[in-house]
Amino acid sequence: MSVPSIPIVKQQFSPKFPRLPSSSLYPSSQSQNLNVPSGAFHPISIVHKEVCSSSCKRIWCSSSSSSTAEPKEGHEVRAQVTVRRKKLGVFVSGGGTNFRAIHEATKRGSLHGDVLVLVTNKSDCGGAEYARNNGIPVILYHISKDESNGSDLVDTLRKFEVDFILLAGYLNLYQWNDPSLQKIYIQHSSITSSSFWRQGIHGMKVHKAVIASGARFSGPTIHFVDEHYDTGRILAQRVVPVQANDTVEELAARVLKEEHQLYVEVVEALCEERVVWRQDGVPLIQSKENPNEFR
């Protein structure tokens, strides 16, 4: 979608945490107020691969893991700026299928980042099990009544030098008073009416509500997180038709399939610094192929 009439303000969406000495990169398992399973922290090999960043002046960019990637014939290369590989922290409360999709994308090289840590409030959930099986540190974290801003967790994430927090099926709300801690969140919703996901409806209940409402379309929505539930700026959506004879399970399966693909595409854009902001504060994703196109 071209947006020629509204000026685009290119902003770096890469908050940087204070760098710590390498000896303190991985936090101790005795962190205060953090129940970290023994042996959970294992060094993760970070493979630095060069890609060129997306900017309004750039014509070609490749996120390929190959260092010999070349621009397509007929494309002019005007600028190539190296973008470092991003460090990701993922939060889950359940099966973690979106987390798996993101991690698999990092392994196959289509996503210019690495999952360094998983945070969960349920130690036996599927997402935590997957993380442990893949050598990803797991932090079990429950916020206490006298510690409402999550400062312990913020400090731990800083030690991992996390660039982005990805909430993938994580339902707890923490009011972190830290503007440098950037978060995005995925939520099942009806794209024709945000009321389904702003009433605290989650999981299969949202698909049931969509069908009961008579809505003809549903789909996943990805938005930034603010201090309230489901009120952050929408970053991406995808349309999923609701069939006349859909069951809740059938609709949920189709939405989930699109959700996995959309979330990976959004994280790819974040890692390649292709998220830009209109002057009215609306976030857009810049096209890889044409920097003048946004969606």
From Swiss-Prot:
Q: Does the keyword Transferase apply?
A: yes
Instruction: Summarize where (6R)-10-formyltetrahydrofolate binds, as residue positions.
Output: 171-174, 230
Which residues make up the transit peptide? 1-62
Q: Where is this site: Raises pKa of active site His?
A: 230
Q: Which GO terms describe its molecular function?
A: phosphoribosylglycinamide formyltransferase activity
An annotated GO BP = 'de novo' IMP biosynthetic process
SUPFAM superfamilies in the record? Formyltransferase
Quick one: which residues bind N(1)-(5-phospho-beta-D-ribosyl)glycinamide? 96-98, 259
Any one Gene Ontology cellular component term annotated for this protein: chloroplast
- Give the E.C. number(s): 2.1.2.2
- By its UniProt entry, which InterPro entries does this protein fall under? Formyl_transf_N, Formyl_transf_N_sf, GART_AS
Q: In which tissues is it expressed?
A: Highly expressed in young and mature nodules but weakly expressed in roots and leaves.
Catalytic reactions of this protein: N(1)-(5-phospho-beta-D-ribosyl)glycinamide + (6R)-10-formyltetrahydrofolate = N(2)-formyl-N(1)-(5-phospho-beta-D-ribosyl)glycinamide + (6S)-5,6,7,8-tetrahydrofolate + H(+)
Q: Its annotated pathway?
A: Purine metabolism; IMP biosynthesis via de novo pathway; N(2)-formyl-N(1)-(5-phospho-D-ribosyl)glycinamide from N(1)-(5-phospho-D-ribosyl)glycinamide (10-formyl THF route): step 1/1
User: Where, subcellularly, is it found?
Assistant: Plastid, Chloroplast
Class of enzymatic activity (EC top level): transferase
Q: Which domain of life is it from?
A: Eukaryota
Q: Which UniProt keywords apply?
A: Chloroplast, Plastid, Purine biosynthesis, Transferase, Transit peptide
- Locate the active site: 188
Which PANTHER family does the protein's record reference? PHOSPHORIBOSYLGLYCINAMIDE FORMYLTRANSFERASE
Which family does the entry's similarity section mention?
Belongs to the GART family.
Q: What is this protein called?
A: Phosphoribosylglycinamide formyltransferase, chloroplastic
